[in-house]
């Protein structure tokens, strides 16, 4: 990806902040004890809240896996210890794909 996905996520979060959204919604990144990562990104009251997302589940090994879905108004991603950027890249590609479709319309 062209830019660092952490920087991109920071920019996406900032673009959602409107003096209201950030008081009820946000982004959570936590560790799992198996070990791994879990990410929850609130989509309610964003342009993404009604967008369809095709669930992704890949298990390469016990330590190299990802699972991403949208449920209850949240993008939810989980993965192994070294899969955090892969999860962020999946979210980013989904957002950017939707944005490019809007530009073409």
What are these regions (language model features)?
Residues 1, 29, 79:
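Conserved aromatic-histidine-acidic binding/catalytic patches
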Residues 2-9, 34, 42-43:
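Generic detector of short, locally flexible boundary/turn motifs and exposed helical patches
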Residues 3-6, 10-20, 83, 99-105:
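Eukaryotic low-complexity, non-globular regulatory regions
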Residues 17-56:
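Amphipathic, interaction-prone secondary-structure segments
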Residues 56-104:
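Helix-rich interaction surfaces within compact, conserved domain-sized segments
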């Amino acid at each position: 990806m062209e830019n660092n996905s952490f920087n991109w996520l920071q920019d996406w979060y900032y673009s959602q902040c409107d003096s209201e959204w950030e008081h009820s919604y946000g982004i959570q990144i936590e560790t799992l004890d198996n070990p791994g990562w879990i990410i929850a990104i609130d989509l309610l009251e964003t342009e993404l809240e009604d967008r369809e997302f095709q669930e992704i589940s890949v298990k390469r090994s016990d330590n190299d896996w990802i699972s991403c879905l949208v449920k209850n108004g949240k993008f939810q991603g989980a993965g192994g210890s070294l899969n955090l950027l892969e999860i962020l890249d999946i979210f980013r590609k989904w957002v950017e794909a939707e944005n490019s479709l809007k530009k073409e319309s």
